[in-house]
Amino acid sequence: MHFTINGRSYEADVDVRTSLLDLCREHLELTGSKKGCDHGQCGACTAMVDGVRINSCLSLAVMHEGDKITTIEGLGTPEKLHPMQAAFVKHDGYQCGYCTPGQICSAVAVLDEIKRGVPSHVQADLTDRPQATNVEMRERMSGNICRCGAYSNIAEAMAEVAGAKA
């Protein structure tokens, strides 16, 4: 199977039952995304497929042949951080760091969702364009769990990147 992950082409011969997360971690040595619960409940495995965030532990790799997949490794480098990565550092949006790759991938995708006008559950009027408010961003990030409780710092990092007030 052919995959494009973080702008790089990969060929992989994996069992059709292999999750996208296991493809990345076990076969391609892209270990940034974490396996927290392996049930889609924690968000530690969040990656983006064609710009849409997914729980990579719940998605079979074979479903994404030919898709453009982005993991935390594809967002920035230690020398040139993605703006969201830099904001997480600035605002201490991490503590133990286990959930951080998934949080950052989700945060990047959340801001893109808002920019594209994708509605959410907290909007009073689904015909209005969503705004990057604290409530809006927190609702959209609710699928990403941080056991250390860095939620306020994560919200501050997202607000900085969005140009909004946390």
Where are these regions (language model features)?
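Signature of N-terminal electron-transfer/Fe-S-associated modules in redox systems
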Residues: M1-A166
